[in-house]
């Protein structure tokens, strides 16, 4: 198993697919990395040489923010919104949908399981 950006990449898969196992790299960025490094798209991870793995590692470290750094930046952005007290920050703080979705019905994923209200009847 190759290890890139702290993630074990599955050896049997094509490199383009295997790179998407890294948080912050989707299909588009994976293909972009392959084009930069010059590795054919149909090549599988177990066929990569150590030099090619090193090239991929360096390309990711140089050009992309992935894994822990990306997660940290995302959480810091959310924390900043919450500290500002803006509308989006309040929605994050209250655990409600942030992007304008309705909450009268639905939004159960964000709000959690339904809570029974004592004394309320239909």
From Swiss-Prot:
Region (Disordered): 99-122
Pfam entry (one): Ribosomal_S13
Presence of the UniProt keyword Magnesium in the record: no
InterPro entries documented for this protein: Rbsml_uS13_C (IPR027437), Ribosomal_uS13 (IPR001892), Ribosomal_uS13-like_H2TH (IPR010979), Ribosomal_uS13_bac-type (IPR019980), Ribosomal_uS13_CS (IPR018269)
GO biological process: translation
SUPFAM superfamilies: S13-like H2TH domain
Subunit structure comment from the entry: Part of the 30S ribosomal subunit. Forms a loose heterodimer with protein S19. Forms two bridges to the 50S subunit in the 70S ribosome.
Function according to Swiss-Prot or TrEMBL: Located at the top of the head of the 30S subunit, it contacts several helices of the 16S rRNA. In the 70S ribosome it contacts the 23S rRNA (bridge B1a) and protein L5 of the 50S subunit (bridge B1b), connecting the 2 subunits; these bridges are implicated in subunit movement. Contacts the tRNAs in the A and P-sites.
Protein name per Swiss-Prot or TrEMBL: Small ribosomal subunit protein uS13
């Amino acid at each position: 198993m190759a290890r890139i950006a702290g993630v074990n990449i599955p050896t049997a898969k094509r490199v383009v697919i295997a790179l998407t196992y890294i948080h912050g790299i989707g299909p588009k960025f994976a293909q972009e990395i392959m084009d930069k490094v010059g590795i054919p798209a149909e090549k599988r991870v177990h066929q990569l040489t150590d030099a090619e793995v090193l090239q991929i590692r360096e390309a990711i470290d140089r050009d992309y923010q992935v894994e822990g750094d990306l997660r940290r930046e995302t959480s810091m952005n959310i924390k900043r919104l919450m500290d500002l007290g803006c509308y989006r920050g309040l929605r994050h703080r209250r655990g409600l949908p942030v992007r304008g979705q309705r909450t009268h019905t639905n939004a159960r994923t964000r709000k959690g399981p339904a809570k029974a209200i004592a004394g309320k009847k239909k």
